[in-house]
């Protein structure tokens, strides 16, 4: 799936993550800022990438500002950002969820 | 070699610095030799010096050990002014031996390390930019971290030999009688500084408030003081202590506090004449409030409260629920003011408070203590020194010392953000699990299996689920996932002494 527009979901409150998706053409490129990057950086990138793959998004620039979010939060924020970026926010892709 | 809590202590450090590896929390009854400082005799007529530069030029030489206290906390002005003068004079190779380092001192210490002025540090702790710099290998020699009681011990036994102590005081007369209670920069107890005043080769008081001779009550006495320096400002009163202490509204902290209170009141130690120490954290303050109600309901009064004092503890004193406060430092203005006005609030020095090599310290008489933790592991070992990223950001404070109480409770949330507090192995062991009796989290408690008696008495409290510590660790991991192990280099950046002076752990340089 092609990203139609730059979209954002989430906040920078503690225990949240802010995901910004924009067009890319070189796979999924995650730029992660996180206080727990050393311990959980790989896991955070994996959750974001896996979630985007379920939307069949294969090219995207992802800016992720993490404030200690758990996996379920990361997944939820990524789904929302992806729905918005694909202009699908009114037609939720339930199969992906 | 591996010490008794399983930490690898490099052999060269044990050998070169003549250290023993940690073995036991038992102190026993050894004979200990104390040291006494050289005294330069004077009649007291010419002690006043008008500038920091003049006193530094007169007293500080390359290679010396200098000390400060941290009673002025984040409002401290003295440390930065004195260190700047020392750097300006090009003095090198000093050992910095303060009672602790606060954030307001960080940038100056980093600067002094970079200029070669400071080459060794011993402290209770460090945080922020300084902790980060040290963890990244800025200092060639490892920092030595000691608890408040251990610092007192090391000074008394000559392990820390202070050449010049620079002690900021909110008042002094011209001959050096001073206390911490009066003046713009009043902070209450001088507990930690009293060690320096008693044992340093040269004692320099710095004050912005010269008062008529003789100044009483004198916590630091003219018999101990070499010079009195008049300065423009000792500290910023607004930042010395936090203002009015606010009770937490955080439901997680309140839940923890409630359970801590249940543990205390169901323990055999909760009886008339018991004693306790609480810290200054949100949950600890809330415990004081619950404990007050429990004391009223059960008509129980405490004989004394110990340690760092806050206004809620002072309120208990005024209400007659606590008979005495034994005060080594004051965390807020209410506590500091009270020391001036209430004879039942006794100033105590760090040795009286917590020195293990003593003819009894106050902590030896302590029944119940509530302490915090950055991490606690399945062996009940506690880390209050390094963060989850391995970087130094804490202080031992009185943790190891107070943990010798009859009932030592660690109050901590199961997780903080994505970081588990209950872990398989703490990053750095500060207080050994042998000292810890109960862990209280928001989901329930874990009792150290070595305490068979407590397993029995605390296992059936309504609303207080009991888990094994392994179960709590698993619960934490289910929430946050399994973190990747931290990476460190081979370089040792800090040594963690146990309160008896043995090595309980070392901190390695973080790999980035």
Curated annotation (Swiss-Prot), chain A:
Species lineage: Bacteria, Bacillati, Bacillota, Bacilli, Lactobacillales
- The gene is citD
Q: How does it assemble?
A: Oligomer with a subunit composition of (alpha,beta,gamma)6.
What UniProt keywords apply to this chain's record, in alphabetical order?
Cytoplasm, Phosphoprotein
Domain of life of the source:
Bacteria
UniProt entry tagged with the keyword Magnesium: no
What cellular component terms from Gene Ontology apply here?
Answer: cytoplasm
Q: Where in the cell is it found?
A: Cytoplasm
UniProt source species: Oenococcus oeni (strain ATCC BAA-331 / PSU-1)
Q: What is this protein called?
A: Citrate lyase acyl carrier protein
Residues annotated with O-(phosphoribosyl dephospho-coenzyme A)serine modification: 14
Q: What does this protein do?
A: Covalent carrier of the coenzyme of citrate lyase.
Record-linked InterPro entries: CitD, Mal_deCO2ase/Cit_lyase_ACP
